[in-house]
Regions:
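Vicinal oxygen chelate
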Residues: 5-14, 55-151, 179-180, 224-336, ...
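Short, charged/polar, Gly/Pro-enriched secondary-structure boundary elements
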Residues: 47-51, 111-114, 187-191, 249-251
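Active-site beta-strand termini and strand-to-loop segments that position acidic
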Residues: 41-46, 54-55, 106-109, 181-185, ...
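A compositional/structural signature marking long, glycine- and acidic/polar-rich segments
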Residues: 172-238
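Core segments of cupin and vicinal oxygen chelate
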Residues: 1-48, 148-188, 193, 335
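An N-terminus-focused feature that recognizes amino-terminal "leader" regions
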Residues: 1-78, 82-103, 329
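Conserved active-site tyrosine of GNAT-family acetyltransferases
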Residues: 19-24, 80, 111, 156, ...
């Protein structure tokens, strides 16, 4: 009955046209369905991954978490009811709208709408990105991750770890408190940041080429006010990314090169080097916290903090072996 991955997300917006442009011409997703009040965006072979609808408020609407099959969905529903969680079985009309076979709906302790489903519809039609990109890294890893905020972490984190069985990956305490959780080999599918406010911090979408990130950053630099966090590289999931403000006001992380973790042998631990190896100047932090983050990054650089790149077949070429001194020092190299 374990959750497998983040399968889809729903988003509320006051301006659907802005989301259509942002999702396609900036993020590179494919617009597959649009009406007066809703639109759907595709990232891969799934018929839809991001569902946006018009609303008086901006923000997330729902998070769709995937299970393997009908038996897993029924087992989870029974487990939730036994744990005192009020659930509703999704109607046939809702399942059709979400493009899935079946789903259940419930809320976490701070009011986030969660949908758990199985049997997402797929298509054999080639993915046609809204701008020229290599594609998104999805598959068994899911569509990316969501980082939520909470007024009191102790009010919500146990729900995800003890009832929904999210597994802790790691956590950091400076320059802000953040806790990361995995379902599969993606370093985290969910995280929480302690902000004193319930809501969302960001969603992350991962592309298959570093150049896709750099070219999106060039687009963002033409409107500097949309950049919430500058280009940089995370210490824990090792993603190279930047963050932009979506039309719904929350941040979207656009990244490349996330690490794959060995879930069977993983030990949760504190990350003492801060959230980033370099870059990622966070405009959303208070001035004192922003300066603290910069000081931490300088310390990481001085201590030789670094990590290997995470590549996959088709997006790299191995450089010719022309550095004997590099090979000779391989055992002593610090790679994170």
């Amino acid at each position: 009955m374990n959750l497998n991955a983040l399968g889809y997300v729903g988003i509320r917006t006051r301006n659907l046209e802005d989301w259509a442009a942002y999702g396609t011409r900036f993020l590179g997703m494919q617009l597959v369905d649009k009406s007066r009040g809703t639109l759907a965006l595709r990232m891969d072979d799934r018929k839809q991954r991001v569902i946006v609808h018009t609303d008086e408020d901006d923000g997330p609407s729902f998070y769709g978490w995937e299970v393997a099959d009908a038996a897993a969905l029924d087992a989870l529903a029974a487990h939730l009811e036994k744990s005192g969680v009020k659930i509703a079985r999704g109607s046939r009309a809702l399942a059709d709208e979400r493009r899935v076979k079946d789903l259940i709906v419930f809320a976490d302790p701070i009011g986030n709408r969660l949908e758990v489903f199985h049997g997402a519809e797929v298509t054999t039609e080639p993915f046609k990105p809204g701008r020229s990109i290599s594609g998104f890294r999805t598959g068994v890893l899911g569509m990316g991750h969501a980082v939520l905020t909470a007024e009191r972490l102790e009010d919500v984190v146990p729900f995800y770890t003890e009832i929904l069985n999210f597994k802790p990956t790691d956590y950091l305490l400076k320059p802000f408190k953040a806790y990361f959780f995995h379902l599969n080999a993606r370093h985290h599918s969910l995280a929480f940041i302690d902000t004193g406010k319930n809501g969302i911090h960001h969603m992350m979408f991962e592309v298959c080429y570093l150049d896709d990130v750099g070219q999106a950053y060039d687009l963002a630099l033409r409107q500097p006010e949309m950049i919430g966090t500058t280009l940089g590289r995370h210490a824990n999931d090792q993603v190279t990314s930047f963050y932009s403000y979506s039309p719904s006001k929350f941040l979207v992380e656009y990244g490349w090169g996330g690490r794959s973790i060995d879930t069977a042998n993983w030990t949760p631990h504190e990350r003492t080097e801060g959230p980033s190896l370099w870059g990622h100047d966070r405009m959303w932090l208070t001035p004192d916290k922003r300066e603290e983050a910069r000081t931490i990054r300088v310390g990481v650089a001085e201590s030789g903090g670094r990590a290997p790149l995470n590549v996959m077949d088709g997006n790299y070429l191995r450089a010719a072996d022309v550095c004997p001194w590099w090979n000779a020092n391989a055992p002593a190299r610090k790679t994170g």
